[in-house]
């Protein structure tokens, strides 16, 4: 008879680690150079302002966590499978309410229990072990998928839907849509104004998402995924024969993006050198290049250093982590 085990758990837990000890009382802070109450023997006497408003209703963050799983073994225990589903809904998270108007005063921050994040995912693992005469072999794998959605975080209302963090996964990359490079001064004159620095042929062109005639922070959109993979997986396999064995372990990740640093994208960063892959840069004779024009001036290069689809790339991978060849000595 096959082995079958069902399991489930549900509960609510609290977390007070992010709650500052005395924020429920507010805070007064000295302002010696801004608010002067008088002078004592040539020394300015500063006043105090309330830079953090009191919030006596603060409480700890809460999480409702659901886990459902199954363990089974089939075919005379040669096949074992484990599958689990989880759901983690966090609420009353301790975050700054950026919707509080500055009209209430010179307030540094006002934290409330208004944050909410929902997460869910699955974990799977399977293993097959068997023998054929003097041969033994196994093959197994693991698979994990998780994602989340920011429901509320106290962010201010945004003029465009693509600027909102709410409704999007945490850690998602945001940047500009690169549309290649300017190839002439005529293209620059006919294009939206790029507000980062003066541009010239060979600089990166960005898409004007909101169609207002200029490229600025209002044109930043979600691009790719975050730096933490949504999918992680592994494959392990092996074969044995009369004391000899070969085993291998593969690891992989998917649905992950990475923003490459300046030293990878821009030659001569921090007084460095130029790498071989950076030689594929724009010139009037080589307009179908991978990188923008060559320059050593940081200010001139500011336009080309923006976070964009030019430097945020797919970071999926599959690698062979270990490969082992072994022989077990006989006991006699």
Question: Over which residues does each language-model region extend?
Answer:
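Residues on the lipid-exposed face of transmembrane beta-strands in outer-membrane beta-barrel proteins
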Residues: 1, 8, 68-72, 83, ...
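Solvent-exposed loop/turn elements at secondary-structure boundaries
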Residues: 2-61, 80, 84-117
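Transmembrane beta-strands of outer-membrane beta-barrel pores
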Residues: 10-14, 85-91, 128-130, 143-149, ...
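Conserved small-residue
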Residues: 22, 112-115, 129-227
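Flexible, surface-exposed loop regions and adjacent strand-edge segments
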Residues: 23-29, 98-106, 155-164, 263-272
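Outer-membrane beta-barrel signature, preferentially recognizing the C-terminal barrel domain
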Residues: 34-80, 109-132, 167-174, 226-232
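Repeated loop/turn-to-beta-strand initiation elements of outer-membrane beta-barrel proteins
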Residues: 77-81, 122, 133-135, 243-247, ...
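Extracytoplasmic gating/loop element in the C-terminal half of outer-membrane beta-barrel translocons
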Residues: 253-332
């Amino acid at each position: 008879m096959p082995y079958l085990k069902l399991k489930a758990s549900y509960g609510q837990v609290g977390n007070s680690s992010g709650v500052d000890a005395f924020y429920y009382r507010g805070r007064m802070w000295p302002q010696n150079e801004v608010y002067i109450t008088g002078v004592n023997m040539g020394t300015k006497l500063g006043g105090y302002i309330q830079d953090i408003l009191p919030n006596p209703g603060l409480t700890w963050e809460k999480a409702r966590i659901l886990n459902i799983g199954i363990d089974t073994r089939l075919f005379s225990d040669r096949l074992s499978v484990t599958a689990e589903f989880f759901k983690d809904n966090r609420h009353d998270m301790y975050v700054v309410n950026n919707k509080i108007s500055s009209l209430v005063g010179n307030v540094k921050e006002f934290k409330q229990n208004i944050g909410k994040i929902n997460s869910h995912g699955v974990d799977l693992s399977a293993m097959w072990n068997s023998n054929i005469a003097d041969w033994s072999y196994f093959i197994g794998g693991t698979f994990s998928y998780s994602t989340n959605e920011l429901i509320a975080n106290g962010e201010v209302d945004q003029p465009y839907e693509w600027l909102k963090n709410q409704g999007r996964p945490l850690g998602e990359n945001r940047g500009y849509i690169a549309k290649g490079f300017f190839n002439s001064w005529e293209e620059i004159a006919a294009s939206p104004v790029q507000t980062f620095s003066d541009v010239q042929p060979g600089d990166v062109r960005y898409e004007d998402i909101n169609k207002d005639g200029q490229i600025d922070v209002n044109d930043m959109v979600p691009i790719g995924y975050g730096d933490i993979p949504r999918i992680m997986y592994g494959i392990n396999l092996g074969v044995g024969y009369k004391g000899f064995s070969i085993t291998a372990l593969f690891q992989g990740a998917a649905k992950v993006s990475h923003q490459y640093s300046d030293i990878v994208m821009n030659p001569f960063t921090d007084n460095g050198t130029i790498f071989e892959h950076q030689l594929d840069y724009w010139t009037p004779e080589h307009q179908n290049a991978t990188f923008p024009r060559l320059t050593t001036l940081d200010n001139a290069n500011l336009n080309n250093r923006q976070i964009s689809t030019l430097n945020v790339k797919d970071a999926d991978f599959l690698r062979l982590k270990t490969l082992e060849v072994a022989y077990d000595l006989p006991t006699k």
